[in-house]
């Protein structure tokens, strides 16, 4: 059986390749799809760049997505191979969380309604808890990777940095020197942790929660670019943004702090921040729910061992004490969110290219990267 897809719009692009909006060439199938087309990896050989195949992140995403199925994880429909190019076909979502945040930052109300915020947050945690229960770390949670359907159903996407936790073939640090987008990167990663836990995902969720409240990134540091692929620079401005709000980490708050490779860098900061100002910040975003603050503080613990787990967060009183929110929060709401912007400014779109040829071979369960 051959399934074809007609590209009708360009969604976005990145280092991995491009994402398109598509429909099925089968007129009886009315669904919309998102097609992620990977560009081939290139390797410099003398003066020429040679195509060497699919990237490691693409292989990871394909393997992981074929093995998992959950209501809050974007569903893989099919893997396509055409002209040596691999594409992944996903279910389509009309929105992403970054777009929702930007919508509210420009609106008169300037706040995401509590019932919508609570539902989106719970669904993100629910999807991440499923990943963790299946020994998977996402490692790149951020608003742009949180897809949301027209009814408000969360679909976590982009598992290109996803990693199996159990029985890895290689240590985390040896295969991926840098994980998690800078504003959502946990302090143990900033301090050079070679081994880390799913707690890094929980920190990222805490940052996303704060961003939904304030409608701007909670810790917006300037990233220091890598000049040498073998040397990861200490992200001093990102660490500073965290300390300005949470205070300077200490051994009392974070046992084992001195064992991190970049611990010595903390002494280079001219100012020592003594207080955790998160409660005061919480008041400035006009939020008076003490249970929400408690959850946020438990997510943003310096010590990863003290950080709440995703499974524990699902049962936090912030969610269980309120039965008025649903997992379809956009229904019966006066707010109309515009759909993700789709462009036709791309050669694939202008040619209305049809993708086909299913990659039918089943993957085996695997261990490792």
Curated annotation (Swiss-Prot):
EC id: 2.7.11.22, 2.7.11.23
Record key words, sorted: Activator, ATP-binding, Kinase, Magnesium, Metal-binding, Nucleotide-binding, Nucleus, Repressor, Serine/threonine-protein kinase, Transcription, Transcription regulation, Transferase
Reaction(s) catalysed (UniProt annotation): L-seryl-[protein] + ATP = O-phospho-L-seryl-[protein] + ADP + H(+); L-threonyl-[protein] + ATP = O-phospho-L-threonyl-[protein] + ADP + H(+); [DNA-directed RNA polymerase] + ATP = phospho-[DNA-directed RNA polymerase] + ADP + H(+)
Residues of the signal peptide: none
Annotated localization: Nucleus
Subunit structure, as described in the record: Component of the Cdk8 module of the Mediator complex. The Cdk8 module is composed of srb8, srb9, srb10 and srb11. Interacts with med17 and med18.
Family listed: Belongs to the protein kinase superfamily. CMGC Ser/Thr protein kinase family. CDC2/CDKX subfamily.
Name of this protein: Serine/threonine-protein kinase srb10
Protein's organism: Schizosaccharomyces pombe (strain 972 / ATCC 24843)
Recorded name of the encoding gene: srb10
């Amino acid at each position: 059986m051959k399934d074809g897809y007609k590209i009708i719009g360009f969604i976005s692009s990145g280092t991995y390749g491009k994402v398109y909006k598509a429909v099925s060439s089968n007129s009886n199938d009315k669904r919309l799809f998102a097609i992620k087309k990977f560009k081939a990896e290139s390797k410099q050989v003398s003066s020429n760049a040679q195509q060497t195949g699919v990237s490691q992140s693409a292989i990871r995403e394909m393997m992981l997505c074929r093995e998992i199925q959950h209501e809050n994880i974007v569903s893989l429909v099919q893997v396509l191979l055409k002209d040596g190019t691999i594409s992944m076909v996903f279910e389509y979502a009309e929105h992403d969380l970054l777009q929702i945040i930007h919508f509210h930052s420009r609106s008169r109300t300037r706040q995401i309604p509590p019932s919508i915020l609570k539902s989106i947050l719970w669904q993100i945690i629910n999807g991440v808890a499923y990943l963790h229960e299946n020994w998977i770390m996402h490692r790149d949670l951020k608003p742009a990777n949180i897809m949301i359907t027209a009814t408000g159903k969360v679909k976590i996407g982009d598992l290109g940095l996803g990693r199996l936790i159990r029985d890895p073939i290689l240590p985390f640090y040896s295969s991926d020197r840098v994980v998690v987008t800078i504003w959502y990167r946990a302090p143990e990663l900033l301090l050079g942790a070679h081994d880390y836990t799913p707690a890094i995902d929980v920190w990222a969720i805490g940052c996303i929660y704060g961003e939904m409240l304030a409608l701007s990134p909670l810790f917006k540091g300037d990233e220091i670019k890598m000049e040498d692929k073998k040397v990861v620079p200490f992200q001093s401005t990102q660490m500073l943004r965290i300390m300005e709000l949470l205070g300077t980490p200490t051994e009392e708050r974070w046992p084992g702090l001195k064992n991190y490779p970049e611990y010595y860098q903390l002494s280079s900061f001219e100012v020592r921040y003594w207080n955790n100002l998160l409660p005061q910040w919480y008041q400035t975003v006009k939020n008076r729910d003490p249970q929400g603050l408690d959850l946020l503080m438990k997510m943003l613990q310096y010590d990863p061992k003290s950080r709440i787990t995703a499974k524990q967060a699902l049962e936090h009183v912030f969610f269980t004490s309120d039965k008025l929110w649903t997992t379809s929060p956009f229904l019966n709401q006066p707010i109309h969110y515009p759909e993700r912007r789709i462009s036709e400014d791309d050669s694939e779109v202008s040619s209305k290219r049809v993708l086909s040829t299913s990659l039918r071979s089943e993957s085996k369960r695997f261990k490792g990267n």
